[in-house]
């Protein structure tokens, strides 16, 4: 017997008004919880709550505390859920005991779904770190559905550990360099972020746009306060270029030890952080093109030296184009098909050789065609010969 029938029986048996009200409230509460659960139910994981509908209200009707992490939503049972959006569709990543654990699950999914430009709660994985590089390869070797399934089943760390062991077993040991010290500059660098340059970044604008989240985190600027209070005046000020931060000079050292100086500033008109002066010379010398990546690093020591590195995409070789060009030239320079001449009764009969096909099927068709042509030519020759004989006898 369900709760509704119990309430009806209680009401029919002459229960007090207070009991009726309590039973009705309990029935209403049960219906509300059931409705909220169905609204936030995920088909792939029954019982998972989303960030819409009833997820902001607990059993007593109060609001749940919001999370400070991206992609993390609180649950009425005190646990924390993680989710990510893919093509405007919510992908539920599972329910976790701790808020930080749910945030790490979101970071894993974000780096698989978004790639190197993913915005994460904690430090993103970098290829410069050997451990992180192994995890990046592990994520790249798994599909999005497989990563989501591992996160939901809480088996991601176990699968990652097994993959690291297998990778270490088949990888050769790194060469030993006694002269190198653990305090070398390359080992002490901290990877900040990578920026994939766009056509406008390497064009004639002479500027590189730094993503806002990375700029405010790693290269903060003291922006001037707004000088106007009117929205119309503020818009006019922005259109005129007012409010722009003059910026500072940042020194970056590349892999060859050369120091590059860039002017780093904030453009109020486009509300973007940019590297301007010195950037075009860097693009020209490094040969950057759209799609190449630029990495930014900082020394882990007290000097906080900045480093810059280029990751140029492999350009397609021209061997295939050269081979195609040579084949086209050879085809154009090929001699015309041979022409056979047959002299019959003082008349030259010209017959052109049929082109040969390369494949076996084409060869068979050509052979049959030749036979038909030979038969037709022989019949024509017989008729022509007969006419010539009759003409000679008359």
From Swiss-Prot:
This is AP2/ERF and B3 domain-containing protein Os05g0549800. Keywords: DNA-binding, Nucleus, Transcription, Transcription regulation. Residues 1-75, 168-188 are annotated as: Disordered. It is found in: Nucleus. One of its GO terms (cellular component) is nucleus. It comes from Oryza sativa subsp. japonica (Rice). PROSITE patterns: AP2_ERF, B3. InterPro entries: AP2/ERF_dom, AP2/ERF_dom_sf, B3_DNA-bd, DNA-bd_dom_sf, DNA-bd_pseudobarrel_sf, LEC2-like. Residues 11-29, 178-187 have a biased composition (Low complexity). Gene3D superfamilies: AP2/ERF domain, DNA-binding pseudobarrel domain. Pfam families: AP2 (PF00847), B3 (PF02362). Residues 68-123, 193-314 bind DNA. Signal peptide: none annotated. One of its GO terms (molecular function) is DNA binding.
């Amino acid at each position: 017997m369900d709760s509704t029938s119990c309430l009806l029986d209680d009401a029919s048996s002459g229960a007090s008004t207070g009991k009726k009200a309590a039973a009705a409230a309990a029935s209403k509460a049960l219906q509300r919880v059931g409705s909220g659960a169905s609204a936030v139910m995920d088909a792939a994981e029954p019982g998972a709550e989303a960030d819409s509908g009833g997820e902001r209200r607990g059993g007593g009707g109060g609001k749940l505390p919001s999370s400070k992490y991206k992609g993390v939503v609180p649950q009425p049972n005190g646990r924390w859920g993680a989710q990510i959006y893919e093509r405007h569709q919510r992908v539920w990543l599972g329910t976790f005991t701790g808020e930080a654990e749910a945030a790490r699950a979101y970071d894993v999914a974000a780096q698989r779904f978004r790639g190197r430009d993913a915005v994460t709660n904690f430090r993103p994985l970098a290829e410069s770190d050997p451990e992180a590089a192994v995890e990046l390869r592990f994520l790249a070797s798994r599909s999005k559905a497989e990563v989501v399934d591992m996160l939901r089943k809480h088996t991601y760390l176990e699968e990652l550990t097994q993959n690291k062991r297998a990778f270490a077993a088949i990888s050769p040991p790194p060469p030993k360099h006694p002269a190198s010290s653990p305090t070398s500059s390359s080992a002490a660098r901290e990877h900040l972020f990578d920026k994939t340059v766009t056509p406008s970044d390497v064009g004639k604008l002479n500027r590189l746009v730094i993503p806002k989240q990375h700029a405010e985190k790693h290269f903060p600027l003291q922006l001037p306060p707004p000088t106007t209070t009117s929205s119309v005046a503020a818009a006019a000020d922005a259109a005129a270029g007012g409010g722009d931060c003059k910026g500072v000079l940042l020194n970056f050292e590349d892999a060859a030890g050369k120091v590059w100086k860039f002017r780093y500033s904030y453009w109020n008109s486009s509300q973007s952080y940019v590297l301007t002066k010195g950037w075009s010379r860097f693009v020209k010398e490094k040969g950057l093109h759209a799609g190449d990546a630029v990495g930014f690093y900082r020394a882990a020591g007290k000097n906080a030296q900045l480093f810059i590195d280029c990751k140029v995409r492999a350009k397609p070789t021209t061997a295939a184009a050269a081979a195609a060009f040579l084949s086209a030239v050879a085809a154009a320079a090929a001699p015309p098909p041979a022409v056979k001449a047959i002299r019959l009764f003082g008349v030259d009969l010209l017959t052109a050789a049929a082109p040969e096909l390369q494949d076996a099927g084409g060869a068979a068709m050509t052979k049959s065609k030749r036979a038909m042509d030979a038969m037709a030519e022989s019949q024509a020759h017989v008729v022509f010969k007969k006419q010539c004989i009759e003409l000679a006898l008359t």
